[in-house]
Amino acid sequence: LNGCAKASWAQGKTPVIDAKLVTRNGVLGLSAVDPEDITSTMNYDEASIIAKSIAEGLTLRVDLKAPNIGTGYANVMVNPFVDAKPMRGEVAFNQVQLKILKPFIADVRKLEGNLSLAGKISGTLTKPLFNGEMRLKNGEISMISLPVNLTNVELYSSIRQNEASINGAFNSGRGVAKLTGNIDWKNDPRIQLNLSGKNLLIRQAPLITAIVDTDISVDA
């Protein structure tokens, strides 16, 4: 870990900060929810944090380069010295590996895929808003408590501040399913989803093996 920082402050004035922290060729350790599960580790090439005072407040930038985790950055300007605490900026992450989340979800047997996210940040520090796109490719999900194994999961979401559209597809066995819908969290959260599929494999050996068609709508 390398870094440097300069800071100054005076009565009646906002603090002035100029700091940078960089770490290279490190290892992240992830502990599982279940203590019996194996703890995983992942290497990263470089991670850095930069904080610098500007006329409008403070800029924060985070960069990550990690082939086994993902690459990307977040660059945000925030003014923490006024009541509203406004913020704006941008974020972009590419090839984020979903498997890094598996230790934090107890019911997941397998979780894989590549997640990409890019967009603009606005709003305030307490109520941030995001406008952007999210895409999942080559996903694979299997749950311990559910008799389905989802493969070739492809999911696209367009996020507009307080709502998001969802379009996706996946395989279960040789069957194909499509998922569409919207999620709105402006006031009370509302989820509207439609799942349609044919020849989907439902299997939990040795109890269940079945091929099903489905057309389900959810409005909650």
Predicted segments with their positions:
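Interface amphipathic segments
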Residues: 1-215
